[in-house]
UniProtKB/Swiss-Prot annotation:
Gene that specifies this protein: rpl13
InterPro entries named among the record's database cross-references: Ribosomal_uL13 (IPR005822), Ribosomal_uL13_bac-type (IPR005823), Ribosomal_uL13_CS (IPR023563), Ribosomal_uL13_euk/arc (IPR005755), Ribosomal_uL13_sf (IPR036899)
Keyword Ribosomal protein: yes
One Gene Ontology MF term: structural constituent of ribosome
Protein name, per record: Large ribosomal subunit protein uL13
Length: 156
């Protein structure tokens, strides 16, 4: 499924923040983004596949595999395999999804794998509170790309 990035970015307007997710802890970054979305900010996340999840590799794999296997093809719940969709789903879990306020906030978020050509020259923001090297001293972590590959995604 090809995404028309220029059309997607035009829908956001001119005043949006670009955040580079590489090296950030997924949960911490998602909570910061969710709060900013609720405050009305428009956010674009790039390099979503390079976000990390801390913990033992196989424990993380099993936790995500259990979520993915939970639903049936007919009834759901449907859990994504694409790294950018897993990222969006994580942010969605931190928003009041059942209210219009949460859904409106969710619509102000755009997530991309890699850096689209339209965003090459822009300044990327890093969230210091969510950086793995600043927050955690652990060497046990998995990237979102590895989790996606384990779930069966072949694009990374």
């Amino acid at each position: 499924m090809a995404v028309n990035v220029s059309r997607v970015i035009k829908t956001l307007g001119d005043d949006f923040t670009v955040i580079d997710a590489s090296g950030h802890i997924l949960g911490r970054l998602s909570s910061k983004i969710a709060k900013r979305l609720l405050n009305g900010e428009r956010i674009v996340v790039v390099n979503a596949e390079k976000a990390v999840i801390t913990g033992d590799k196989y424990m993380v794999f099993e936790r995500y595999k259990e979520k993915y296997d939970r639903g049936s093809k007919e009834k759901g719940p449907y859990f994504p395999r694409h790294p950018e969709r897993i990222f969006k789903r994580t942010v969605r879990g931190m928003l009041p999804w059942k209210s219009s306020r949460g859904r409106d906030a969710y619509r102000r978020l755009r997530v991309f794998m890699g850096v689209p050509e339209e965003l090459q020259g822009r300044e990327f923001e890093k969230i210091e509170d969510a950086l793995l090297e600043k927050v955690s001293k652990t060497d046990k972590y998995v990237t979102l790309a590895e989790v996606s590959r384990y779930l069966g995604f072949r694009g990374v």
